Amino acid sequence: MALELGLKGRTALVTGGSKGIGRAIARGLASEGANLVLLARGMDALAVTAGELSTQYGVKALPLAADITKTDSVQAAAEAARAAFGTVHIVVNNAGNPMRRTDRQILWPDTDWIGDLDGKVIGSLRITQAFLPLMPGDGTGRIINISGTASTVVWAPALTHGMNNAAMNQATGYLAHDLASQQITVNTIVPGLVGTEGRQAWADTMAKQQNTTKEEFLAGFCKRMGILTGRWATMEEVADTVLFLASDRARYYTGAKIIMDGGLNVNVRPA
């Protein structure tokens, strides 16, 4: 029996939707017939992505340049989405600042801490608050947050990155409780290491530096990290998890934190 997801004709918002994981999520949703509201800070790549997905899948795709750290910008995006679609069924909070691998983050000025949190967890709350009035109360409303294993594993020295991810996980539970009466489910996907364009480029560089193949470097890296599957996740695998949580098949899931890290969380140690 085919797994019908029931997403055709629904509208999904994806933040950070112009590239990387966000673009893969947007493509997955479009492939299931969902219309799209795509948000990112820059319009150029966003417009290209929206045009490609609209042409390929025959869906409507609205690109909106917006900054999730600015309340006015987020509210303007919500009003544009209302004008275009009226209803937004699915909100995917994917946008976030890149991990900054800087030593001694405790010595940063507090404006840097606040800026990093503003660009992920606080910005995601702004998005949720602004788009909530557009979401239906008929059981099809879905809020899907993207955090990461830095919520539970210390990726030194990425202090604010870990704080952001842990806060996203915790906010999910609170929002699931608050929005249950509106029949809106709220869940978090907790990916481990994902083979984004940037991470693939890093692996290429490291392999060259170590005079080995990329495949050999990645095999050794995953073994050292304790990734039981022996590889990174693909962006499409993250998107597939979003599709399930967005679908009618996930009606009973709320407040969940879906770990997809290839077994990294198992944390195996020799006996």
PLM feature segments, named:
Residues 2-3, 20-21, 102, 153, ...:
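Short C-terminal tail/terminal secondary-structure segment
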Residues 11, 18-20:
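Conserved glycine-rich cofactor-binding loop
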Residues 75, 98-114, 157-160, 270-271:
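Conserved mid-core segment of classical short-chain dehydrogenase/reductases
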Residues 89, 109-125, 144, 161, ...:
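Catalytic Tyr-X3-Lys loop
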Residues 97, 144-167, 172-181, 192-194:
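Catalytic loop of short-chain dehydrogenase/reductase
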Residues 125, 188, 211-253, 260-262:
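C-terminal helical subdomain
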Residues 133, 177-178, 251:
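Alpha-helical segment proximal to the catalytic Tyr-Lys
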Residues 180, 185, 253-255:
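Short, small/polar-rich loop/turn modules that mediate ligand/substrate recognition or access, typified
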